[in-house]
Amino acid sequence: MALRCPIVSVLGHVDHGKTSLLDKIRRTRVTQREAGGITQHIGASEIPINTIKKVSKDLLGLFKADLSIPGILVIDTPGHEAFTSLRKRGGALADIAILVVDINEGFKPQTIEAINILKQCKTPFVVAANKVDRIPGWNSSEGPFILNFNEKNQHPNAMTEFEIRLYENVIKHLNELGFDADLFSRVKDTTKTINVVPVSAMTGEGVPDLLVIISGLAQRFLEQKLALNVEGYAKGTVLELKEEKGLGKTIDAIIYDGIAKTGDFLVVGNPDGVLVSKIKALLKPKELDEMRDPKDKFKPSKQISAATGVKISAPDLDSVIAGSPLRIVPKNQVEAAKEEVLEEVEEFTILTDDEGIIIKADTMGSLEALANELRKVNAKIKKAEVGDISKKDVIEASSYASTNPLNGLIISFNTKVLADAKAEIEKSDVKLLEGKIIYKLVEEHEEWTKEMEELMKSDEINRLTKPAMIKILPNCIFRQKEPAVCGVEVLYGTLKIGSPIMSEDGKKLGYVKEMRDNQQENIKEAKVGMQVPVSIDGNIVLGRNAKENDILYVEVPEPEARKLHHEFKDELRGDEKEALSRYMELKQKIENNIFWGM
């Protein structure tokens, strides 16, 4: 049975050494040509089996490994967002993953998110415990870790420190996340225990061990998955759309099954459904050369077979988006391929709600991953699209916010904000959350939602009529009417400007027009215990329908009293609760209705 290369994805926290480790394997130096030493784009590299056997020759006999796969195809990802982007029907594009962890720093938030994604996609993985060369006293050298891990080559103190860091920074965290894990040479059952392979991207130590473990695991446990369909048409996923000099727009893609030929037709998903275009050229990088930064030009291929990274030149590719499914077929199979791609695109369709927020992402897979994580925290999504944030998105979000402020949010994963959209955001009430880490965006969404809910609750409470009981102070009637002016003491609750006032027998007396403090400054409210002069405009005539020592109440409309009693009671001070309780008892008596306000 012919086997294809297993597709390997590399995940891990920023600066834990993903690209440097791959560079060591490929003997190229991509990282040094990139800004900040951090992977900026997605790429793919083929590592032929002969290369693996060459660098691992000392280990093949030790592990009794008989490798028959043609090699491995490594997707070099910027963190793990690309892993979620690269999907095929049934889950992740990658057959197996390498999770890179700095053995000295241990697990970081992105490490945990990467593991959660791997669990969700049911993708087997190996842990590369990188930067073993930085363990104090460790004598790191190029070659197999297993041959260097002994007291002949290492000081006992360095061996002890290695064991401590291996357990404390790697194995313990894996255990806490529900995985059995151990140093790869101690693993007895690879179906139940995660292999941890110590490596150094600087010296090359452990790279042979890692290649043997990855190749052996893939061949042993994924044989059925790696069976090559030697007669079927090519199936793949778009990595990214690129402008190439002399070729125009091209697609970088991973082919995971079947065979493709020059002159075949490309059938690929796009926002409108399916695009069909005749292939002009299938271009491949040379072996051990990284797809996004080759030192030599691509070479044209008449035929390619899975698994491989390929650059596709064809007309009219502008609307293609990363993460889209693709097929490469002869003319007589175009219609069947269109149906297949359409079905796969529809699987990516995200169910939306009648109301909610807007989410945008750079690829179909990452949009799906973002939506899934937001659903876990009960977020409602009105619109989910691939692409940059436009002015139209902002206007739509603003209209959603007009009915519910919680809907005035756009979450952008790894996309640009167009200039006119930025200008629109500045003059609108729309909130924009941007980022390249899904879990952080979800956390920020939860924090923003909580803040907004508290603000909305506070606004609503402030709009409600606050309960209060006041007493007209003796010898403090300054004007009888139009408006009446007198001194009052707030017995319970909060007296505010505009509060409607009633007597103990339920008669409407007017509303609070003005209040002053001891310095004769106008104030907007008076709280329990305060004695203040007030003016009351309305039917009140002091000395006639309201007298010294009379108790007056703020008249709270029944719907507002009910809201305060049921929804906002915990937000009221103790004296405000007492004012509300006494007022409701009084109204129940006056209205002869024990359910008033309940």
Curated annotation (Swiss-Prot):
Start and end residues of each stretch annotated as G1: 12-19
InterPro entries: EFTU-type, P-loop_NTPase, Small_GTP-bd, T_Tr_GTP-bd_dom, TF_aIF-2_arc, TIF_IF2, TIF_IF2_dom3, TIF_IF2_dom3_sf
GO CC terms of this entry: cytoplasm
Protein name: Probable translation initiation factor IF-2
HAMAP family xref list: IF_2_A
Organism: Methanococcus maripaludis (strain DSM 14266 / JCM 13030 / NBRC 101832 / S2 / LL)
Sequence similarity: Belongs to the TRAFAC class translation factor GTPase superfamily. Classic translation factor GTPase family. IF-2 subfamily.
Chain positions recorded as GTP binding sites: 12-19, 76-80, 130-133
Pfam families xrefs: GTP_EFTU, GTP_EFTU_D4, IF-2
Positions of the UniProt region annotated as G5: 200-202
Region (G2): 37-41
Region named G4: 130-133
Residue intervals of the tr-type G domain: 3-225
Function according to Swiss-Prot or TrEMBL: Function in general translation initiation by promoting the binding of the formylmethionine-tRNA to ribosomes. Seems to function along with eIF-2.
Region span, G3: 76-79
Keywords: GTP-binding, Initiation factor, Nucleotide-binding, Protein biosynthesis
Disulfide bonds: none
GO molecular function annotations of the record: GTP binding; GTPase activity; translation initiation factor activity
